């Protein structure tokens, strides 16, 4: 949905106040006067659903709807955003309140999943005495996706985050993502879906610290301005942080400021590796292995999944157990959730990156033994099982197959529990006159005792 604003009136201000719920266009040729923008932002701030504490899109979409591009990339990216808190526009952020990340979405090939690819990297060097056996194995150095750096020159730092009198901020990246010398070779592709996210902290009116990760998905037009992505098929959202918070209450990682999985995936992708362990920190692989930690440690060809994190702290997940059946993929992934349009990829686009986190591909494991002959036929004689491509995996495990992910993860107990109905007819408290014998009597009936039917592919 694109907004073209030529004049300002009451109706226009109302439409901008609601813009936090929708998208906007790019390349506006007639900017709105600053006074009009401030009025529009103030009106938007008065709408409770636009509060930045709960609406991750409004900081960008309201501005985009008012004719101010959320993102401009003509050299170092410039990000325009507003912060709405307690019905007002917030104007007291400092550079220490924000960190920015930027990534592009690269479509998968040969059956591989689409992946976010960050534009900014740092190099981690393995530390002597850290890692498996305390040795520098399996890698001495590794690249890790990261956030944009702060300027070191005081003058440039002062100009990196600017509050505009019209009621919004402009952040200028230190990294010029159009210069491959600054992006570890990652090429800027304006036509691809991009994402900018903020690690944002601020105080609300009650004095409480708010930690949020607003983000926006967009492409870049010929003028270098953002065009918001409104087609769910043109992004990648596999899981919603609300699913995580169902168990974790409030997800908060890396010091507590990274609270949304849509932000996590911008760094946790195939471009990030832990130098001390050699583990690739792609979010799908890492999170699945963490939740399956106990099973991996006790399975055939077992694995003690360990990551060396902040200040080389060792984090072993061998004692971590998912609080229910590991086959229940829909706890975290569901295409029926509007917030996760790619939530059904676990069953429609099976991949080694996800599946082999639970199905251990170590030498001697059941998976390795069962698939080595297949690899020898489809790849090359003597090829390891993990040499099979995702496209080859889909030949056997695609939708409709008896070996599809949905079929083999079907859980009869879970399905029956959802259908089981028990009616409590009455509850009575029983007591004696001297209170020496007390009891509670519950009468109940079970009108339905369904038998679950497995998927039709069985």
Question: Where on the chain are the PLM-derived regions?
Answer:
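Sec-dependent bacterial lipoprotein signal peptides
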Residues: 1-19
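Bacterial Sec-dependent N-terminal signal peptides
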Residues: 14-50, 386-390, 394, 398-412
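Disulfide-rich extracellular modules and peptides
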Residues: 23, 246-249, 266-269, 331-334, ...
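Low-complexity, acidic Ser/Thr/Pro/Gly-rich terminal tails and inter-domain linkers that flank the onset
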Residues: 43-71, 409-435
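Extended surface/linker regions that mediate inter-domain or inter-protein docking
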Residues: 59, 72-348, 435-458
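Short Fe-S-cluster ligation motifs
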Residues: 270-311, 355-395, 424-437
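Extracellular low-complexity, Gly/Ser/Thr-rich intrinsically disordered linkers
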Residues: 321-372, 395, 401
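A structural signal for beta-strand and strand-to-loop patches characteristic of beta-rich domains
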Residues: 362-370, 398-424
